[in-house]
Amino acid sequence: MTDPLIKRSGIQEEEDLTTLKFPRDLKDAKFLLNSEVAILLEHRKGISESEGTEFPQNTLLIHLYYNSINDIIRTFHKTLAYAEKFSRYKNKTSIKQVRTALSKQNLEEFEIASLANLCPEISDEAKSLIPSLKKMEDDELQAILDELSNLRKFN
């Protein structure tokens, strides 16, 4: 399925998730697992708390208004809550095991993060959620999903 044309910087780019064609600004993006986001945000929160601020002042632009700062803080906490709620893997070791297992497969970075975040149970579900996986045979994809399921059980 092809998404509508998106206009960026005066140039029209076509996005197509079935072929993993992303806009230029996402070309070299690192796709994260929700669990990785949660760990990063918890770390940032810990730094803030040790500095005695809700949000580290050195990362804010001085000209931001009070309401904007509150919006940033509120967004930070909402993002952290979301990432924690939907984290499938609770520690760095589990995340590393999942990334290592999926990296051994013939998967793109986006597919790795999507599979780890969504945790589909069967290949048809995975292909519906992540259209680029339609290139894979069902039994090959199911083996990957079964391995992911086993890793989650021991998490």
From Swiss-Prot:
Gene3D superfamilies with a match to the protein in the record: 1.20.1250.40
Gene Ontology, cellular component aspect: cytoplasm; nucleus; RNA polymerase II, core complex
Molecular function GO terms recorded: DNA-directed RNA polymerase activity; nucleotide binding; translation initiation factor binding
Keyword terms: DNA-directed RNA polymerase, Nucleus, Transcription
Localization annotation: Nucleus
GO BP field: transcription by RNA polymerase II; transcription initiation at RNA polymerase II promoter
S-S bonds: none
Pfam families recorded: RNA_pol_Rpb4 (PF03874)
Primary residence: nucleus
Purpose: DNA-dependent RNA polymerase catalyzes the transcription of DNA into RNA using the four ribonucleoside triphosphates as substrates. Component of RNA polymerase II which synthesizes mRNA precursors and many functional non-coding RNAs. Pol II is the central component of the basal RNA polymerase II transcription machinery. It is composed of mobile elements that move relative to each other. RPB4 is part of a subcomplex with RPB7 that binds to a pocket formed by RPB1, RPB2 and RPB6 at the base of the clamp element.
Subunit and interaction comment: Component of the RNA polymerase II (Pol II) complex consisting of 12 subunits. RPB4 and RPB7 form a subcomplex that protrudes from the 10-subunit Pol II core complex.
Official protein name in the record: DNA-directed RNA polymerase II subunit rpb4
Native source organism of the sequence: Dictyostelium discoideum
